[in-house]
């Protein structure tokens, strides 16, 4: 039990390195835009840089799968994690440096360092996930819990820092309070978290946890298995011993049809398009129109829900494709509500600030919970059976494909055609 919990914590810390770099920059945007010459155009430039970095997984996939070149996974993971540490440390000292690019003053050190972080974050989907195939299946949940922490840690730090606290004068002009600690200190704290992730990875490799795939997790005493049978869906409450017997009766995913595999991969892409591309692009428009606190509660509580929902797979395991399809539909409808709220900005839904606040926060939490749970459940199903490392590679690839597609769709809508409009801070 102690060994399991120790390994679980190490995997979660390792998983937190997946997107903490990019998320840390995003959570500082309110301070960065006030200081840097790009102003509120800065998010558009940074979004473009992150999307260019998404070419990293494509290049890796071509080398690994197309050319069939054998790439040593462990050294490569270590190199990328060290690169993330270097870029995170560089942000502490050079985030506000500028220089001339094509005759205009640009924050090119920030561009370069974010590009390095985004490369690591993007390629983690196709590099870190296959590495997790060597662990016991329960530790895949721990990895996704860590992915949730990669958003939760920067958002909590941002709340403590007080990046967007302000008061309004009689002329409806916002005046921002100074942050409790500087941008450099914020990036330094995230640097230490990234170093902790590197240390966790090295300890995992040193103790050989990835080779001990027979390590059994303590199954919850009462877990719910929802399984797709030949013609019915059964729900059974089982204890530890009967849980393994029931699991063994499930057809091995290696014999699953191509349609089942295609469903899992395509829904993985769809869920991640909503989670990492669509919601993140419009959430500020859907919440800031009601208040700054509404935005902070929506973002922070969503980041709390995400790792908790990832852990839910320990207790509720759904293998029925119709039920998973229904949950995916529910997540899509919730995402549609967020888009609708964003499209209404700067107006309130039902002309009510209270109703809008409740709906915007609730929809953000429901979407975050469903997206996180479905992402873990799809990965767990893809991991089952033979060729689990290859299946998790394609799971990671479709996570990145979905995220890129969602961002690519929303970028012109938000930044080119400007279909969404921000509300004044004071009204």
Swiss-Prot record:
Extracellular membrane side: 24-42, 95-111, 161-184, 283-297, 344-353, 413-427
Give the membrane topology.
Answer: Multi-pass membrane protein
Known regulation of its activity is: Activity is strongly inhibited by riboflavin analogs, such as lumiflavin and lumichrome.
What does the record note about the induction of this protein?
A: Down-regulated by high levels of riboflavin.
Name the chemical reaction catalysed here.
Answer: riboflavin(in) = riboflavin(out)
Q: What does the entry report about how pH modulates activity? A: Optimum pH is 5.
Which compartment or compartments is the protein found in?
A: Cell membrane
Q: Where are the transmembrane segments?
A: 3-23, 43-63, 74-94, 112-132, 140-160, 185-205, 262-282, 298-318, 323-343, 354-374, 392-412
Q: Which residues lie on this side of the membrane: Cytoplasmic?
A: 1-2, 64-73, 133-139, 206-261, 319-322, 375-391
Q: What does this protein do?
A: Riboflavin transporter. Riboflavin transport is Na(+)-independent but pH-sensitive.
Family of the protein in this entry: Belongs to the riboflavin transporter family.
User: What is the protein's name according to its record?
Assistant: Riboflavin transporter rft-1
Q: What organism does this protein naturally occur in?
A: Caenorhabditis elegans
